[in-house]
């Protein structure tokens, strides 16, 4: 990687569709056991985490993605005390979870300890000390194996957040999007728990999205799509919310804002109004007559 232009290929590294980003500085470039890791400074976006040639998050808009991933599920649940995060090596998902004063324990499991190490050193704006919060437990382990062990131990969680690399992207997280894996995830979710997973982009990658959505829908009473435009990704990032008890629309805009206030949660993007905007923006299935 040299100073100049960074080419982001939306579909895959080396793919036919992409965009050029001016690179102002290379802060880190290395390779772990699992993937290539770069921390770049991109003009207009600031610090940027790139894994295997795909942008994961940028300083300018990571809060949009992470607040959208975390807070709908955390806010709809009336008392999220135990939370499991699969992936999320930058620590920003953990940061957002810990904003809720109901949380007693948050376990973050990431297979790549090198990503976590690099994030600790180069991305303090992301984790903001979350790794060292006494409520946080960081586990460097394959998420699939962790879930199996947690099930054997009889552990359970109120909210489980899957913050993995894209289902259409690198293969590192592919097995955690399968029906078998989602079934294991549900086995450590309390009966009134909520699962949320990022799911790529339903509009650009419908086959990958439908695989994720189908796996979730087959196992939960309710599965709902929502989404948010992430400028650095150049697309609407899709998410899937699932529960046997709760739905995204269970709370009014006013109730969302009230819960955020009561829990001491401060956000830059997410709010009661945005909660419903996210549901509308993620309505690809609804527009095509395939709603949940």
Curated annotation (Swiss-Prot):
Function recorded in the entry: Involved in the biosynthesis of polyamines which are thought to support the growth of thermophilic microorganisms under high-temperature conditions. It seems that long-chain and branched-chain of polyamines effectively stabilize DNA and RNA, respectively. Catalyzes the irreversible transfer of a propylamine group from the amino donor S-adenosylmethioninamine (decarboxy-AdoMet) to norspermidine, spermidine and norspermine to yield norspermine, thermospermine and caldopentamine, respectively.
GO molecular function, one term: thermospermine synthase activity
Coiled coil start-end: none
Localization of this protein: Cytoplasm
Keywords of this entry: Cytoplasm, Polyamine biosynthesis, Transferase
Entry's family note: Belongs to the spermidine/spermine synthase family.
Domain of life, source organism: Archaea
Protein name per the record: Polyamine aminopropyltransferase 1
């Amino acid at each position: 990687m040299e100073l100049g232009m960074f080419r982001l290929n939306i579909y895959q590294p080396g793919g036919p569709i992409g965009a050029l980003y001016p690179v102002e500085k290379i802060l880190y470039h290395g390779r772990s056991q699992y993937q290539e890791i770069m921390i770049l400074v991109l003009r207009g976006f600031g610090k940027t985490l790139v894994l295997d040639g795909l942008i994961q998050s940028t300083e300018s808009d990571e809060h949009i993605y992470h607040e959208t991933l975390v807070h709908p599920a955390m806010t709809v649940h009336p008392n999220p005390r135990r939370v499991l995060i699969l992936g999320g090596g930058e620590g920003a998902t953990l940061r957002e979870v810990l904003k809720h004063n109901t949380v007693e324990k948050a376990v973050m499991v990431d297979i790549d300890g090198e990503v976590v190490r690099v994030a600790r050193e180069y991305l303090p704006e992301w984790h903001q000390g979350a790794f060292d919060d006494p409520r946080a437990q960081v586990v460097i382990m394959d998420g699939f194996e962790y879930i199996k062990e947690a099930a054997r131990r009889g552990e359970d969680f109120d909210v489980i957040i899957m913050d993995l690399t894209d289902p259409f992207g690198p293969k590192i997280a592919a097995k955690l999007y399968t029906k078998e894996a989602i079934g294991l995830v549900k086995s450590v979710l309390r009966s009134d728990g909520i699962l949320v997973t990022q799911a790529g982009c339903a509009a650009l990658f419908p086959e990958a999205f439908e695989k994720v959505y189908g796996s979730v829908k087959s196992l939960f009473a309710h599965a709902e799509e929502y989404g948010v435009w992430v400028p650095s990704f150049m697309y609407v990032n899709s998410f899937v919310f699932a529960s046997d008890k709760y739905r995204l629309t269970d709370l009014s805009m006013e109730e969302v804002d009230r819960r955020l206030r009561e829990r001491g949660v401060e956000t830059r993007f997410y709010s009661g109004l945005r909660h419903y905007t996210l549901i509308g923006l993620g309505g690809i299935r609804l527009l095509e007559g395939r709603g949940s």
